[in-house]
């Protein structure tokens, strides 16, 4: 038996990391032109949620972009996944804890994952005080510049929670198909961090930017050739109830003039469903991340 050559997964490493509650599978990738982790270079860093599903997508998107984007800066991708996954799925039950924002003390408990408490605050602390310093130590000579955070679906909702709770945490926030219907649209309630943010973020050059994305077929799907009418109506009813287009548009309209943000962009994929947006918005979001 012969081991794979280093060209199979070059400049990629994996670790299991714990915050004391959950164990994470962290994948870190760095530029192909680096022959050592001690490279002396300025770098941008993108942190990606649901790493089991999206780590390679993010890594390859940066690498495929490099040959045709001559001015692309060096970038490191830090993807946060889990070692234990749901059956036949790239997702873990841990995400329902880590990505879940807290609700007010007098609010009824959320019913999307009954009995699972909020771990959003603890996860922000983990990203900021454990994972990011560790990444900086792993590349001792890198000059770290800007950081971005990407999340899709429930991860996209966490990105919004992090943005309005800790706008200083990342320079660019990328939220794809955020699960805004969660807990009876709690994010639009008077208790949401959307309306309760007193964080001062300094002058315009330090304010974060937000790209919000969704697919045009998420709320209004087309009938598939192989579907019966009954199957289509069932699927259509389920997707319509998620109100992806309505809620993303509503959020964009509410925050597009916000003094908290230096830029807000709404990116619509007219022919994409929910799952496809996860990869599309990540690859396209690189442009926004590097530009803003």
State where each predicted segment sits.
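Non-catalytic cap/lid and distal C-terminal segments of serine-dependent acyl enzymes
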Residues: 1-292
């Amino acid at each position: 038996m012969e081991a794979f050559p280093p060209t199979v997964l070059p400049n990629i490493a994996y670790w299991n990391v714990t915050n004391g509650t959950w164990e994470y599978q962290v994948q870190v990738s760095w530029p192909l032109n680096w022959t050592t982790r001690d490279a002396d270079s300025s770098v941008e860093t993108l942190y990606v949620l649901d790493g089991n599903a999206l780590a390679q997508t993010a890594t390859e998107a940066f690498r495929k972009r490099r040959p045709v984007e001559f001015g692309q800066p060096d970038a490191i991708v830090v993807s946060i996944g889990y070692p234990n996954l749901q059956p036949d799925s790239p997702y873990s039950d841990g995400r329902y804890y880590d990505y879940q924002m807290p609700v007010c003390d007098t609010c009824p408990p959320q019913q999307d994952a009954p009995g699972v408490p909020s771990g959003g605050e603890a996860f922000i602390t983990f990203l900021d005080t454990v994972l990011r310093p560790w990444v900086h130590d792993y590349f001792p000579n890198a000059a770290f510049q800007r950081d971005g955070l990407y999340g899709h679906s429930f991860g996209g909702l966490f990105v919004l929670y992090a943005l309005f709770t800790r706008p200083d945490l990342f320079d660019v926030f990328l939220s794809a198909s955020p699960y805004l219907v969660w807990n009876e649209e709690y994010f639009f309630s008077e208790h949401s961090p959307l309306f309760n943010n007193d964080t001062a973020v300094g002058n315009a050059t330090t304010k974060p930017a937000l790209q919000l994305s969704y697919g045009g077929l998420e709320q209004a799907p087309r009938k598939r050739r192989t579907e019966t009418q009954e199957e289509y109506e069932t699927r259509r009813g389920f997707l319509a109830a998620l109100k992806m287009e309505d809620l993303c548009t509503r959020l964009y309209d509410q925050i597009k003039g916000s003094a908290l943000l230096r830029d807000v962009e709404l990116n619509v994929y007219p022919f994409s469903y929910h799952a496809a947006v996860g990869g599309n918005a990540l690859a396209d979001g690189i442009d926004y991340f590097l530009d803003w």
